[in-house]
């Protein structure tokens, strides 16, 4: 059995098996500030501004926001998104405005068309897929791993992931929730 869980490179890797997936790859930027005294006890998300922030053990603020808005495999970001993310952060927490930015980077996100992941077997015997986690991939790793391990070990989906089937896109059974998937109607 082979399990494919490679995030933003899923489409590229699975194309080598002649699979065309309902995924788009986008850059999601993240930022880290200088070390500060404890300010944020957990993770704070701001849906209206599409902003998230937490504080590392070393005191740096780790934050980010929306995808760059175009398909890309580049692992770098642009200044326009930096400005957008910082505006969202300042709208939520004006006190972070004096923190100095130390670094920024971009990671590739595999975005499903309905904003929900795919945890399923493929039409190729012994090949299983865990993809399309959009913005929540790293945060969802424990539950994702649990459900994917169940599928690989037992051959059928865990009850928590039984709706995350690959064929839902072909059959028109997209998951109707506030997922933040790609927006193919805008491309």
List where the protein language model places each region:
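Flavin (primarily FAD) binding-site architecture
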Residues: 4-19
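Short hydrophobic/aromatic-enriched beta-strand-loop microsegments
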Residues: 21-27
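C-terminal catalytic lobe of FAD-dependent flavoproteins
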Residues: 48, 90-187
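Active-site lid/adjacent beta-loop-alpha segment flanking the redox-cofactor pocket in flavoenzymes
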Residues: 35-126
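Short glycine-/acidic-enriched loop or helix-start segments at secondary-structure transitions
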Residues: 13-16, 42, 73-74, 139
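Alpha-helix/helix-capping structural signal
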Residues: 8-9, 87, 143
């Amino acid at each position: 059995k082979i399990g494919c869980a490679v995030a933003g490179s899923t489409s590229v890797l699975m194309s080598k098996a002649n699979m065309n997936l309902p995924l788009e790859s986008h850059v999601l930027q993240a930022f880290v500030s200088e070390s500060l005294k404890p300010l944020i006890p957990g993770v704070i998300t701001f849906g209206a501004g599409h902003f998230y922030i937490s504080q590392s053990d070393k005191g740096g603020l780790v934050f980010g926001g929306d995808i760059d808005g175009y398909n890309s495999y580049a692992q770098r970001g642009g200044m326009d998104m930096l400005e957008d993310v910082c505006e969202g952060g300042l709208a939520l927490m004006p006190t972070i405005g004096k923190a100095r930015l130390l670094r920024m980077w971009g990671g590739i996100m595999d975005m499903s068309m309905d904003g929900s992941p795919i945890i399923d077997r493929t039409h190729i015997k012994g090949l299983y897929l865990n993809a399309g986690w959009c913005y929540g991939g790293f945060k969802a790793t424990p539950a994702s791993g649990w459900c994917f391990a169940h599928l690989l070990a037992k051959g059928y989906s865990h009850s928590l992931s039984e709706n995350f089937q690959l064929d839902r896109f072909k059959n028109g059974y997209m998951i109707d929730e506030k997922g933040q998937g790609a927006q193919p109607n805008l491309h």
